[in-house]
Amino acid sequence: MGKLIFQKMAVEDYQSDHDLEEPSVYVGTYGKYNGEWGIWGKWISLVKCGDYDTFMEVCHTLHADEEDPELMFQDYENFPERFYSESCMDEDTFDKIMECYDMDDKEAFEAYMDATGDDDVDSFRENYMGEWNSEKDFAEHVIGECYDLDRMMGHLASYFDYGRFARDLFSEDYHYTDGYVFRR
């Protein structure tokens, strides 16, 4: 009967290909950094790792020359800064980075996090209203979706102050950040 042999991939198979713009971290250790090596490690692609356990296994394999490596994530690329920490990456953070990577509207999500402090993707999706050139453009959209001013007001509709309506909307109900609109 044949024997099944599990062959692990080499650390090099998980290295970042910077051209693909995948989320990656430069993985070193505090021991090497504070010792003779200085900054020594490799860029590891979180996408190629696929999950947190594989990522941690790759990191520890990379630094298998140390008895108990204290991992140091010395740099990062292609994911929001708020998810970066030099000293640790937990499974929840790894999963958030991967969820963000899979999004079509990453820039809007980053603007949402900056505006609200909330990094929950479901909250973002619930509160994201789209991309607009200005607060006034969004206000015009809201009025157009909800009311027929021409029918309601006739020729007086041209006197409606969309700018003032926009100020009211964005003073309490909405955020406008980098061209993106979010409910509060």
Predicted segments — roles?
Residues 106-147, 182-184:
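Extracytoplasmic/secretory-pathway segments with low complexity and glycosylation-like composition
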Residues 46-52, 129-133, 159:
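Conserved aromatic
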Residues 2-63:
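N-terminal ordered "arm"
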Residues 50-119:
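Structured domain cores in non-transmembrane regions
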Residues 67-69, 106, 121, 149-158:
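Short, surface-exposed acidic
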Residues 2-14, 21, 33, 139-184:
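Acidic, proline/glycine-rich low-complexity IDRs
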Residues 22-28, 38-45, 70-74, 173-184:
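Ordered hydrophobic segments in well-structured contexts
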Residues 15, 27, 77, 85, ...:
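Compositionally biased, intrinsically disordered low-complexity regions enriched in proline and serine
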